[in-house]
Amino acid sequence: MKIDRKFNFQFNISEPKQKNNIVIFFLNTTQKLNDNYLTLTDAFSQNLVEVKEINCSGAINYLKVTNNSEKKLLVLESEQIIGDAIKQNRVVNSTTLIPEQSTVMLKVSCCEKNRWSPAVANTLSISKSLYFSKGRTSSSTDIFKNQKTDQFKIWDEISDKMKEFKSKSFTGSLEDIYNMKEDNFEEIVKS
């Protein structure tokens, strides 16, 4: 299937790959992508972005993001910012393009219910996994209607997903669900 949107960008969608209740479609293109921006993952790997709590107390729905790059920084809705350098793992509420050499307060939601403290290890990264589609849809609807997400609903949806995947997490972390099922995802990708 080929799609040509208003950005005049073409890509192919692969045939679905499925294992049990997981289906993956790959997007492929031969076109050179616009390179006047960095993704959050790329910026992290090049040490061009800083992500911190907004102050020492923190705020559940905001993170302070500093783009130290000479390029814009593209932060995608549903990306998970994970690690113990922040008080809890967060998921990005909406796609944001952060200007070069600037700092913004990024709207996020908590995706790790039972932790509110940083740790000594001071690790921080971007998850390989995005917030699941049902959760994204629900959050987007809440943002559209109320200009904010319903944090309790997000935690309930993550809890439901844990039950569905038969996974457990001491901190109620969305990332733990994906880590427990990573072998399944890797097997689908390799097939």
Positions of the model-derived regions?
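Early extracytoplasmic/domain-onset interaction patches
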Residues: M1-I54, D176-S191
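Short, solvent-exposed loop/turn segments enriched in Ser/Thr/Gly
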Residues: N55-L63
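Mixed-charge (acidic/basic) macromolecular-recognition segments
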Residues: C111-S191
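Asparagine-centered strand-capping/turn motif at beta-strand->loop junctions
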Residues: L63-L73
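Elongated alpha-helical scaffolds
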Residues: K72-L76, L106
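Generic alpha-helix detector with strongest preference for long hydrophobic helices that associate
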Residues: R5, Q46, N89, S139, ...
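Short acidic, gly/pro-rich beta-turn/loop elements at beta-sheet edges
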Residues: N34, V75, W116-P118
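Intrinsically disordered, low-complexity Pro/Gly/Ser/Thr-rich segments with frequent PxxP/GP/PP motifs
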Residues: K2-T29, Q80, D84-K128
